Every structure is written in structure tokens, then in C-alpha cells.
Amino acid sequence: MFIESFKVESPNVKYTENEIHSVYDYETTEVVHEKTVNGTYQWIVKPKTVKYDFKTDIRVPKLGVMLVGLGGNNGSTLTAGVIANKEGISWATKDKVQQANYFGSLTQASSIRVGSFNGEEIYAPFKSLLPMVNPDDVVFGGWDISDMNLADAMARARVLDIDLQKQLRPYMENIVPLPGIFDPDFIAANQGSRANHVIKGTKKEQVDHIIKDMREFKEKNKVDKVVVLWTANTERYSNEVVGMNDTMEDLMESVDRDEAEISPSTLYAIACVLEGIPFINGSPQHTFVPGLIDMAIRNNVLIGGDDFKSGQTKMKSVLGDFLVGAGIKPTSIVSYNHLGNNDGMNLSAPQTFRSKEISKSNVVDDMVASNGILFEPGEHPDHVVVIKYVPYVADSKRAMDEYTSEIFMGGKNTIVMHNTCEDSLLAAPIILDLVLLAELSTRIQFKSEGEGKFHSFHPVATILSYLTKAPLVPPGTPVINALSKQRAMLENIMRACVGLAPENNMIMEFK
């Protein structure tokens, strides 16, 4: 059974006009290596319970979202999709009359289990857990190095059906991105022809320009909060250099000196941190150099990334987890992609492809490390990623994967998968989820037993991991890539905010 909404009744939950307060017992384990009476060591696992207080502000703000790369395939597709949903637009395809929807969005189109009733499982919308911004109410803006209006950008992208594009054109032809930061050293040379709409000046002047743009956007649109997300070209990997970008002070001094190695994406992120605005990196480049992470932590400003997890990598994070969890040993993973959109064109340059290769290649690391029966220390499956540019297929990316595994008694198992990933139609709802969850997380505060004051989540937002290929985590935090664990983490944190136990799937009431 599916219900649209619910309210929790519990002595551990209190609803006020502006907040939800919950008291939550977090049950976990502590693992220690102890010396026994005979002088040997053994591993001891000790269950423990930590009491947490959560406080969630339920006043939903008017949200503005500024996209870096607003005129790209993702930016134009997302903006078009939100307008179509808000206006209730329908259009004819070769199969049927299609209604606008938010399919592919975790927050808008997925469900969570809330319990059982008369022997039947009860589910509710994911978005019913906590008050969230309605995507129809989001105000979009942003930057692009191309001055093309969003109606023409939508046509250039070749993602949406023509009938839909015709209906959306009046809403989009007057939306023109702000000029963007362009540095030809960081992206493929083939992008130069699009760069007719750029911010001039030194890196310091560019940061100041972005800050001015964000302030004016917020004032003009009368929004309460702004979230900025990078959905522009993948940059080449930025080098970490001691004395240049390893601390906040060094990074800011490097900006003042106009150091060449400070990338455009890092400049946008710096501007956001200085303004207290959340910044999310949707591409695989090394935006978050150590100095920027240091800066975000010291200023307590949310940052998240890296790289949207939409197609091939999402499947890999499921299949890899399944194989290792089933006691099957993956020994070779070969991934081949070809696509024909501007992302593929930019990735045809070796230096930008390297960023994507790094992002895609680490996705099974935590799964391999979890099973010392299958893998010796340091052992890892052979893992190869290939991406080729084929203009004809446009945004309809093809992903082909071959998984070779060792099974019982020396046997071999091979799984081959072909995945047609409509690139921007998969990425757009993920962008939506990222900005909505980033905003929501800024309204949640908590404290553990013994702490005097409530505080926000760590600025490095692991809560967004489900949506990213290479999750950014705080220093010293394990990276979790298994998709089921990432979703469980996100859902269970939100459940804790309303005093609900984590979904453990034991269903003891039916045993």
C-alpha cells in the first residue's frame, strides 16, 4: 500500500511551529584489538548506543539554484524539465502523449517503507520524510561561456522531443546565462569556439565577479537561499602543490598572485565559500584541492561532489556489491563508452579524460576491501575504462561492460551488459536531488549525548554520496561506493530526524 504522507507519534519526537525535534538512539559497534590473559591478541566487537538529538527547521525557503554550465545539455534539460512540470505540459511522442514528470529523482519519484498495516507493507514518498523545497518553485540561473539563450541551447542539445521544445521555447528564449570563467588550459581545445561569453580579468577579479553575480541573483529573484552546482565541462586534473593550494591561506594568496594552476571550478567554489553558499561539483575534476576543503571546513560551508553518478557507474556500484557480497570474485572489469554530446567532445582530449578515468575507476575499491576471503591485501580487479566520441549518437550514450569473475572450484563467470544511457535525462534529476538535499541538510542540526550545542553536519557533505561517482568525504572518513549502503545512509539519517528507526529489513513482526 502507498500513502502520500504521515506523521510520527512518539515520546521521542516533538513537532513545533518551526521545527521537528527528535531524540534518537544510534546503535553501532566498537571494534578493539585487546590483549588476552595468555598474551595473545583478539578482536573484540562491542555493541554501543549513542543518544543523539536532532533539530530540523521545517520552514521551507524560496530556493535559487545557479548552475555553472547553465546553457549546456544538463543545464538546459533540467531547466526545461522543471518548467514543463510547473506548467503541466504534455506533448506527443511517437508512442503516446507524455506528461511531464520527475522520474529518475530520488527525492521526487522514489519511496520509503514506513511500516506494515494488516499484513501489508506501507510505503510513502521519500520526500514525505522531511519538508523539502518543491522543485516547481526553484528559481534557476547561472553562468555559461556561451551566450546562447536556453531555448536555442535546448535545441542544440537534441535531448527533448521537438513538440516539447516548441511548447517550452516561449518560457526559455529570454533566459540567457551570465558570462562564465574560461581558461583554455583546463578544458579541451575544441571548446574554444563556444567561448564567446567570458569573464575577463585576474583570478581575484573573477572571484569578485562571481560573488557580485550571486548577490544580484539573490536580490533580483527575492530568494532566501542559493545553491551553486557545477555542471560545466570536465576540467583537467589540478595539481596539488605545497605552498600554492594546500591550505586556505596559500590558496587565497595564489588567487591574489593569479597562479595559473587555480582552475575555474575552484574559483567558483571559493566565491561560494566566501559567501556562505553551498557548492556542489558535478564533474570529475580536482576542484576540491586541500586548501579549498580547509577553507570550507573553517567557514562551515557545505561542499559536495564529485561527478554525477547516473549510468554506467551506478550499475557498477550495484553489480560490484552484488558479486562480492555473494562470495564471487570479480577479477576483471572492462568498461567502454561512446557518446556524441559536448561532454564527449570535451572528454576526447587526453587531459580531461584522465579526470573522468580517475572518477570512474575507484568505484569498487571499498567492496574489494570488505572481503579478505576473496582478495589478498593489495589485490584488486583489473579495471579499464574507455570513452570515445561518436557525434552521431549525441546525448544517447552507450555503455558496455564486461565483468569476469572467479567462481566455485576454479570456474569462470562472465557478465556482459549493454546500457543505453540518455545522458542528460539521467543527470538532470540527479542535479535536482543534489541541490534539494544540500538545502535540506543546511536546516538539520544535531548533537550527541554530552555535547552542549547543536551543530550542522560536517561541511564536506557525505550525505550526498548516493548521487556522486567519487564521493567527497571528510579527512579520515571511509569512502563508501556501494549504492545500497549510500541510499540506506541517506534514508536512515532522514528517518532519525523524525524519530524513526533505521530500515533494517528484519521484519520480525512476520517471523
Swiss-Prot record:
Similarity comment: family membership: Belongs to the myo-inositol 1-phosphate synthase family.
Keyword Protein transport: no
Protein name: Inositol-3-phosphate synthase
Coiled coil: none
Function: Key enzyme in myo-inositol biosynthesis pathway that catalyzes the conversion of glucose 6-phosphate to 1-myo-inositol 1-phosphate in a NAD-dependent manner.
CC terms in the record's Gene Ontology section: cytosol; nucleus
Pathway assigned in UniProt: Polyol metabolism; myo-inositol biosynthesis; myo-inositol from D-glucose 6-phosphate: step 1/2
EC number per UniProt: 5.5.1.4
Superkingdom of origin: Eukaryota
A GO molecular function held by the record: inositol-3-phosphate synthase activity
